[in-house]
UniProtKB/Swiss-Prot annotation:
Name of protein: Ribosome-binding factor A
Signal peptide: none
Lineage of the species this protein comes from: Bacteria, Pseudomonadati, Spirochaetota, Spirochaetia, Spirochaetales
PROSITE patterns: RBFA (PS01319)
Family: Belongs to the RbfA family.
Cited Gene3D superfamilies: 3.30.300.20
Keyword Cytoplasm: yes
Species per Swiss-Prot/TrEMBL record: Treponema pallidum (strain Nichols)
Amino acid sequence: MKQVSQLRVRKLGEHIRAEIAQLIMLGKIKDPRVSPFLSVNWVDVSGGMVCARVYVSSFMGKYKTKQGVQGLESAAGFIRSVLAKKLRLRQCPRLSFVYDESVRDGFSLSRKIDRLESGGVQTEHA
């Protein structure tokens, strides 16, 4: 199988991310589990551009976000056909959707750091 340049793979991932985000935001995906509050964080496209893993998160909570990911997984065929037309690809990568906890983890870590800093400031003034 032919390897594709890393730059092209990255650009394709960014285009896929933007198109899927727009489909979600505009309500083009009719599955009721897919909320406009879902966020497509990034897309990992395989070197041969055969598969793409789409990382999704939301501030709505773990259960609702996982439901949204399942809705996207159910609509993967529709999304893939839209992508193939918009991106003018001979073969659009197979899509898989993954619940991404990295944003939630980062937010939690940031809050912990803020609490430590504010606690440190209070003890300095005491």
